[in-house]
Amino acid sequence: MGATYSTTWPEAHNMPITPQIKRSQVIAFHTSTKWKFHFDSLKVTNKLVVIDFTATWCGPCKNMDPIINDFAAKYTDVEFVKIDVDELADVAQEYGVQAMPTFVLIKKGKVVDKIVGADKDGLKMKIEKHRVMFI
């Protein structure tokens, strides 16, 4: 019994006992209805939302995917959303997206910044600028 029980403890697998840090993830939306419902729920928060407007055929978008995933892991206080312009053309049009990738930064339901193109450093700078919250 002891052997079976001990394998469930983290130290039995050389795992740390401390709790895991919550990893942010990129949320993909495939319907306008789900996006609008989610967007409405964010209007009451001060959380920065980064919308990644992308397309499956877009080479620079694919190059940015691992960078966005890294940012989501690093900036866990920021929400990262992915919207395919071919699936949700109405949402892309609403934000004036004309080129991919386009990153729209939103706080309290309002656009606070925008980056057009695969500009990793520019996006990082704007995320760091807008994620600062005053308590």
Which stretches of residues belong to each language-model region?
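N-terminal targeting signals for export/organelle localization
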Residues: 1-27
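Acidic, Ser/Thr-rich intrinsically disordered and amphipathic helical segments
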Residues: 34, 63, 67-70, 110, ...
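A short beta-strand-turn-helix
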Residues: 28-48, 89
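Non-catalytic, surface beta->alpha helical segment in thiol-disulfide oxidoreductase systems
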Residues: 98-135
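Short cysteine clusters
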Residues: 58-61
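Thiol-based oxidoreductase modules, predominantly thioredoxin-like and allied folds used
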Residues: 30, 53, 64-90, 97
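Structural cue for short, hydrophobic secondary-structure segments
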Residues: 52-54, 105
